[in-house]
Curated annotation (Swiss-Prot):
inhibits Kv1.3/KCNA3 channel. Keywords: Disulfide bond, Ion channel impairing toxin, Neurotoxin, Potassium channel impairing toxin, Secreted, Signal, Toxin, Voltage-gated potassium channel impairing toxin. Residues 1-24 form the signal peptide. This is Potassium channel toxin alpha-KTx 30.2. Has the structural arrangement of an alpha-helix connected to antiparallel beta-sheets by disulfide bonds (CS-alpha/beta). Belongs to the short scorpion toxin superfamily. Potassium channel inhibitor family. Alpha-KTx 30 subfamily. GO terms for cellular component: extracellular region. The keyword Disulfide bond applies. InterPro entries: Scorpion_toxin-like_sf. Disulfide bonds join C30-C50, C36-C55, C40-C57. Expressed by the venom gland. It is found in: Secreted. Its main location: secreted. It comes from Scorpiops jendeki (Scorpion).
Length: 66
């Protein structure tokens, strides 16, 4: 068990990083939120935002947003 656990953690970390990198390839690069409006227009009830260096389409799931 002590020798297998570090291997499992390393493999899981590598898989997460590979998936995250693959998923990010489809994202639109941006420098401000206005560049993301067209990218997010295919979704309904979302707020376009430039987070980091790529567009995110944030969905409000109820509640009060200030």
């Amino acid at each position: 068990m002590n020798k297998v656990f570090p291997f499992v953690v390393i493999v899981a970390t590598v898989l997460i990083l590979v998936f995250d990198t693959t998923d990010a390839k489809g994202e639109k690069k941006c420098s401000n939120s206005e560049e993301c409006v067209k990218f997010c227009s295919e979704y309904s009830d979302v707020h376009p935002a430039c987070i980091g260096d790529h567009c995110e389409c944030i969905r409000w799931e109820g509640g009060i947003s200030i």
